[in-house]
């Protein structure tokens, strides 16, 4: 009913456009986030004119659940809502209105290119135009046909197929232009749309979802060539006292040519491939920003760029996402708003904050009793401000609360707990939840977790 009532409130021409850019599996591995060994000149340039959130976190360390959470502004709720990659917001929370539908009902023209919702059919009717992908079937069809839809381009890749999944190699370096791979097509479509939407006469919400640096690590050769060597993680071992619920992701094993995390040559190739893909996305992002400037639209367009969750690159002996370690949950988030501040924010923020922030910046009311996040507008006006003390993450029955010092998690079924003190152990190498000195912290954060969950699950949104 809220969306129907909102139809009467058309957005006026003073409302700013929104360019909403997501990159799959992108952790804060950029120069602007202090990583010296990676080449991200375009992200770094953008960061200088934006607010960079240094303590931004996803709410679920897997694409399907994270994206459903971002686009509805709602926390995951195990075991009924946003629990894994298979989830759909339209099924798990059928009464919730996605940001696309909310903006459409308020007079925005909304467009989805590439990977925005994990499943292209999820809330497809909430957009002004049908969501677009170069290959609508997604990454689950025609795996063995390596040249079917620009996933693998080297003929050699077609000789290496995982017989269990029919997927090709976990990485590829093809001597091709940026436009050859799938993300090149996503950029091309977005550039055309940007020009088209400029002349439409109404504000727009243009979502651009890059597939990389998600597996497989396939990027043009010139980006691989940037990394003749990459530094390896120093803590390639399981943290002491880590609960058994925290395990390595098996995602990469669905591809061909895979080894184990203790194989240093394999691990080096994993990190090199990830870095190459990040630099590839950086180059595409730079082209998009250049076109925004060329079209004269930068002064009336909000730009939001972020990753949907983190990724382990050998830390803790893990390769992939799917954990409650900070390497899996911390994400890059940068927001540029014409006329507002630029700088670095140390405030704890989470991806559910994006929805209310967009509503606030666009001058429209938010859906009643739906959103779990807070608007980041106070920080966008003054980066020294803070809007919250902690963030909430959930994964496979594990509840996670992080603040500026601690990473705490608990599993209700087993009673196991996890606590890392970032003042003493920034890399999370020792679980101290069983240390008597930290008992007050465990009790405090456990109580705070219950408060967060009580607020977040105040209303039943599932069928």
Segments the model singles out, each with a brief description of its role:
Residues 1-411, 416-417, 426-463:
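Formylglycine-dependent sulfatase
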């Amino acid at each position: 009913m809220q969306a129907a009532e909102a139809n009467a409130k058309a957005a006026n021409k003073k409302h700013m456009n929104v360019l909403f850019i997501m990159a799959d599996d992108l952790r804060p591995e950029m120069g602007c986030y202090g990583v010296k060994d990676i080449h991200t000149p375009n992200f770094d340039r953008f960061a200088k004119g934006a607010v960079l959130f240094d303590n931004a976190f996803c709410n679920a360390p897997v694409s399907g659940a994270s994206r459903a959470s971002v686009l509805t502004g709602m926390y995951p709720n195990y075991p009924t809502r946003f629990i894994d990659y298979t989830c759909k917001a339209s099924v798990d929370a059928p009464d919730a209105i996605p940001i696309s539908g909310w903006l459409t009902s308020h007079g925005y023209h909304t467009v989805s290119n590439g990977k925005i919702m994990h499943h292209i059919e999820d809330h497809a009717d909430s957009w002004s135009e049908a969501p677009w992908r170069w290959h609508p079937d997604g990454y689950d069809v025609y795996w063995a046909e390596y040249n079917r839809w620009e996933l693998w381009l080297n003929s050699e890749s077609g000789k290496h197929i995982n017989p269990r999944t029919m997927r090709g190699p976990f990485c590829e370096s093809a001597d091709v232009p940026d436009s050859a791979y799938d993300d090149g097509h996503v950029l091309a479509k977005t550039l055309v749309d940007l020009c088209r939407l400029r002349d439409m006469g109404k504000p727009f919400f243009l979502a651009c979802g890059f597939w990389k640096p998600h597996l497989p690590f396939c990027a043009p050769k010139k980006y691989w060539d940037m990394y003749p060597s990459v530094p390896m993680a120093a803590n390639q071992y399981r943290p002491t006292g880590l609960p058994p619920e925290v395990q390595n992701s098996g995602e990469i094993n669905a591809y061909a040519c895979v080894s184990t995390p203790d194989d240093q040559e394999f691990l080096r190739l994993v990190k090199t491939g990830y870095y190459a893909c990040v630099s590839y996305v950086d180059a595409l992002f730079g082209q998009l920003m250049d076109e925004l400037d060329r079209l004269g639209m930068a002064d009336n367009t909000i730009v939001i760029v972020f990753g949907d969750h983190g990724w382990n690159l050998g830390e803790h002996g893990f390769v992939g996402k799917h954990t409650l370690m900070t390497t899996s949950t911390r994400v890059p988030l940068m927001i540029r708003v014409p006329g507002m501040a630029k700088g670095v924010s140390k405030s704890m923020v989470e991806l559910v904050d994006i929805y209310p922030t967009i509503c606030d910046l666009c001058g429209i009311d938010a859906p009643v009793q739906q959103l779990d996040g807070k608007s980041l507008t106070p920080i966008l006006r003054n980066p020294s401000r803070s809007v919250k003390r902690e963030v909430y993450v959930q994964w496979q029955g594990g509840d996670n609360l992080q603040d500026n010092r601690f990473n705490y998690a608990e599993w209700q079924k087993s009673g196991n707990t996890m606590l890392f003190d970032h003042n003493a152990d920034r890399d999370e190498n020792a679980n101290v939840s069983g240390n008597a000195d930290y008992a007050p912290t465990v009790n405090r954060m456990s109580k705070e977790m219950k408060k967060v969950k009580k607020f977040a699950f105040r209303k039943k949104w599932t069928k």
